């Protein structure tokens, strides 16, 4: 039936050609060629049907995979943001997840149309290894960025000491972290340097301890000095009273008695409490005629007779 229809189409084309064009065509050759094509289609219709189904399935897999990857990526981004993860890192991780899903979807679609997926995976693996060797330093920073996001030893708006630099954390990117120093400089630190070194976080705890070294002259009354220093501490409202307050003689220095004073205050009050207490210590010691020694140079003049 299909063969008869093809022959009818061939003859119709010949009639149209004779009527509307001046090009002469060999009727027998045209019909034979079309008949051969029709015969091939009849013999391979099952194969063509199978390829059509596989190609359609591959397209459906790609479309569905793209749709699912977008949904999962957006959902992951929202979850990361709700857990107070930096928006830049959340966006990068969600995008990375989307590309991974798309890659596996593409491999599955290729397998559906008969492509050997093992070869594709091998090629992707070799390409990934080459890229990894070329970007070894960047990948180490990327891995360090993932650790910073996961372990969270520091967060934005926290004041940290990274050994070579100290400052407030502005952003934690996937490859680097930016800090603002106390004098307003912006410092970019590779994440690998942060993970491989010591991290001192000054903002994580709500309270911090101030420490003072107060030096007085050797002729001072030790008990009176301790009493004065402790009185100043106890009168300061910003000092946390339920934490240990330590006042004591810590050293007999070459030219002074050194007293150590330790007290706790809220993190955001640390510097102002330190400055105010230092001024109050000096005023109270002066009121009680207790001298604070300072370096002196004795010059002896000898006169020759």
UniProtKB/Swiss-Prot annotation:
Instruction: Name one matching Pfam family.
Output: MS_channel_1st_1
Q: How does it sit in the membrane?
A: Multi-pass membrane protein
Quote the Gene3D superfamilies the UniProt record gives: 1.10.287.1260, 2.30.30.60, 3.30.70.100
The source's superkingdom equals Bacteria
| GO cellular component annotations of the record | plasma membrane
User: What UniProt keywords are attached to this protein's entry?
Assistant: Cell membrane, Membrane, Transmembrane, Transmembrane helix
Spell out the InterPro entries in the cross-references. Answer: LSM_dom_sf, MS_channel_1st, MS_channel_C, MSC_TM_helix, MscS_archaea/bacteria_type, MscS_beta-dom_sf, MscS_channel_2nd, MscS_channel_C_sf
Q: Name one GO molecular function term.
A: mechanosensitive monoatomic ion channel activity
Regions crossing the membrane: 52-72, 89-109, 120-140
* Annotated family: Belongs to the MscS (TC 1.A.23) family.
Q: What is this protein called?
A: Uncharacterized MscS family protein BU452
Species the sequence originates in: Buchnera aphidicola subsp. Acyrthosiphon pisum (strain APS) (Acyrthosiphon pisum symbiotic bacterium)
Upper classification of the source organism reads:
Bacteria, Pseudomonadati, Pseudomonadota, Gammaproteobacteria, Enterobacterales
């Amino acid at each position: 039936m299909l063969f008869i229809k093809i022959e009818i189409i061939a003859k119709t084309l010949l009639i149209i050609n004779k009527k509307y064009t001046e090009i002469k065509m060999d009727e027998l050759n045209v019909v034979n060629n079309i008949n051969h094509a029709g015969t091939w289609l009849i013999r391979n219709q099952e194969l063509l049907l199978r390829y059509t189904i596989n190609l359609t399935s591959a397209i459906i897999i790609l479309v569905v995979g793209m749709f699912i990857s977008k949904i999962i990526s957006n959902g992951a981004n929202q979850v990361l943001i709700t857990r107070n993860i930096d928006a830049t890192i959340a966006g990068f991780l969600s995008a990375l997840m989307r590309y991974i899903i798309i890659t596996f979807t593409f491999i599955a679609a290729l397998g559906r149309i008969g492509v050997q997926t093992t070869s594709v995976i091998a090629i992707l693996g070799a390409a990934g290894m080459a890229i990894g060797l070329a970007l070894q330093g960047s990948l180490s920073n990327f891995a360090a960025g993932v650790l910073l996001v996961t372990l969270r030893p520091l967060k934005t708006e926290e004041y940290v000491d990274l050994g070579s630099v100290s400052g407030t954390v502005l952003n934690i990117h996937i490859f680097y972290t930016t800090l603002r120093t106390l004098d307003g400089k912006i410092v970019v630190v590779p994440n690998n340097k942060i993970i491989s070194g010591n991290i001192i976080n000054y903002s994580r705890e709500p309270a911090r301890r101030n420490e003072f070294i107060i030096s007085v002259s050797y002729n001072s009354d030790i008990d009176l000095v301790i009493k004065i220093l402790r009185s100043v501490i106890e009168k300061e409202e910003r000092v946390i009273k339920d934490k240990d307050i330590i006042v004591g003689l810590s050293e007999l220095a070459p030219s002074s008695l050194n007293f150590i004073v330790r007290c706790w205050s809220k993190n955001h009050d640390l510097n102002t409490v330190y400055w105010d207490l230092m001024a109050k210590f000096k005023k109270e010691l002066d009121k009680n005629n207790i001298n604070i020694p300072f370096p002196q140079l004795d010059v002896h003049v000898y006169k020759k007779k």
